[in-house]
Amino acid sequence: MAGRHALVWLREDAQWQAVTPGAQPRLRQWFAAGLPAVVARGDGSQAPGSVRLGVPLPPSEGKQRLALQAHVADIARCTAPLTLDAVTPQAPVAVQPLLQALLAQARAHALRPHVFGSFAWQALTGLTYVHAQSDLDLLWPIETPEQARALVTLLQRWEQQHGLRADGELLLPEDNAVNWREYAGTAQQVLVKSNQDCRLLPRAALFPVRSAA
């Protein structure tokens, strides 16, 4: 089972349970339209064999995030978040050159960012999620501290050049993640998110040393 930010499509006969009060009718419509939910971090409240999911509604519906639980066995399909190159054609026309510039810089560093948040949901649903103040939320698979430092520099320069805010996380080894802005800071400890919890870890623990085979 994939972790946080993964996209899941439920079976038509899935027996999911709404956690957000009153959300069941809207969730029924959502899944009937063939739309996915996103995997949320486990908090220990879900039943064995089940997963916490979220459905973020567009601004026209108050940007409410609907929470639900579903059995893992009721998942018909599960994929990684959309890549930036897949999202770019669905973004507002004025923003597309900025995203293309970021994509080119990422490729130059052998990085392939994934997208979550408003830009991703607009591409997935065809509904209007992106507005003038929308941030670009990105997930960056990173394997080494050298890659992380290069990425921080890349993102800082891109924001300065284009005026669009890029939020998101560095996806670290062992299914951990850290906010890239926090990583760019000077604190000796950073907040690390996993599929099950959040905890403070020293920077030195983010990239475990791997012995040669």
From Swiss-Prot:
It comes from Xanthomonas euvesicatoria pv. vesicatoria (strain 85-10) (Xanthomonas campestris pv. vesicatoria). The keyword Nucleotidyltransferase applies. It comes from the Bacteria. GO terms for molecular function: nucleotidyltransferase activity. NCBIfam families: malonate_mdcG. InterPro entries: Holo-ACP_synthase (IPR017557), MdcG_C (IPR049180), MdcG_N (IPR048903). Keywords: Nucleotidyltransferase, Transferase. It is an enzyme of class 2 (transferase). Transfers 2'-(5-triphosphoribosyl)-3'-dephosphocoenzyme-A to the apo-[acyl-carrier-protein] of the malonate decarboxylase to yield holo-[acyl-carrier-protein]. This is Phosphoribosyl-dephospho-CoA transferase. Belongs to the MdcG family. The active site is at D135, D137. It catalyses: apo-[malonate decarboxylase ACP] + 2'-(5''-triphospho-alpha-D-ribosyl)-3'-dephospho-CoA = holo-[malonate decarboxylase ACP] + diphosphate.
